[in-house]
Amino acid sequence: MYHQAIKDDIHDWLGFRGSFYDAYDAGARKMFWRQMDENLYTKYKFGIDAWWMDASEPNVRDCTPMWYRKALSGPTALGTSTEYFNAYSIVNADAIYHGQRSVNPNQRVFLLTRSGFAGEQRYSTATWSGDIATRWEDMRAQMTAGLNYSMAGLPFLGLDQGGFCAENRPLAPPREVLHPGNGQAAPEEAPEP
């Protein structure tokens, strides 16, 4: 576990004091899977078909400068968080993939994760791009990110379509959805306020 967050009394969004585990440590990965297995997977008699791993990067606290995020996320078993920060999701995926296969080698693993890293598909992992604000420019950026992600050789990316309301502003008029072949004329696009 990363200790700086405990020393600084950091609380997660639910209000619990804690930190992230060091996924770069093989023993920590085994412990992480053991907790998932005992409290979820085996407990529900292998009734879990897929995992949705939100927060699969060591984002101990939002809205902090990068130097402080890295201080909260290290040091890792491999070295400084500055050197290994972006690879967290792949070693976290390794823990889940190999953990589930060790318990039930005949069941396919599927993992949806909020953070991606090159090569993660070897662990049956797909990436979800993460939360976005409810603005058209953010949706447009999702399309660009998805194309770039796919061009990097990663086969599957889910884009966030709903987003979070990041600003206090009036809602745009509702947009109509057209269904081809039903004779509806195209409506004017609702302007963004």
Annotate each predicted stretch with a short phrase.
Residues 1-193:
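Catalytic-domain carbohydrate-binding cleft regions of carbohydrate-active enzymes
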